[in-house]
């Protein structure tokens, strides 16, 4: 889906501020406790303190429970585009419910909003599926940490199968395998 804005305006600092406000809106509306998994560029911005920014926050959740009305309130308060936070990724090839299994708690806001980040290896696999220029840049950053942790091509393939059930989305483009092999060489 095309975004309402093309400028990357969401950074670690304002993402934290918006999540804090979102927690306040959740409390105000009384919709209960929420757990959100952040993936994509926003996960990279929150994980790596390299000044990364993004055009939106890609989220995954198991229960929506009127969360979007709170998100729209945050958008109105800060003058953000309606799609500043969205779950479009849940309708993409790179999504898998297995992403929740290894997610890491980033922060809890106001004891009502838990924000999780996709595990580095899962994020790497997601970016292998998408394989856009901005994903390739993120994969460079992720590969450095994965190499340090002894992650090999075989480990990536095993994790890929855990997420997607088979290797089809990896093997559908030979460039992905070659790229991954080159990145994970020690």
Model features per residue range: what roles?
Residues 1-38, 42-186:
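Compositionally biased terminal segments of proteins
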């Amino acid at each position: 889906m095309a975004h309402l804005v093309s400028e990357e305006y969401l950074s670690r600092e304002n993402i934290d501020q918006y999540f804090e406000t979102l927690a306040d809106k959740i409390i105000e509306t009384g919709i209960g406790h929420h757990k959100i998994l952040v993936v994509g560029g926003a996960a990279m911005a929150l994980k790596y303190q390299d000044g990364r920014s993004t055009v939106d926050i890609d989220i995954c959740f198991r229960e929506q429970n009127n969360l979007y009305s709170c998100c729209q309130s945050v958008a109105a308060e800060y003058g953000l585009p309606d799609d500043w936070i969205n779950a479009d990724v849940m309708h993409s090839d790179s999504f898998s419910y297995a992403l929740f299994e290894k997610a890491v708690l980033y922060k809890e806001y106001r004891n009502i909003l838990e924000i999780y980040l996709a595990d580095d290896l899962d994020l790497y696999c997601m970016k292998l599926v998408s394989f856009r220029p901005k994903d390739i840049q993120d994969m460079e950053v992720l590969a450095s940490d994965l190499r340090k942790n002894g992650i090999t091509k075989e480990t990536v393939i095993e994790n890929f199968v855990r997420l997607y059930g088979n290797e089809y989305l990896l093997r559908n483009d030979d460039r992905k395998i070659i790229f991954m092999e080159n990145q994970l060489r020690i």
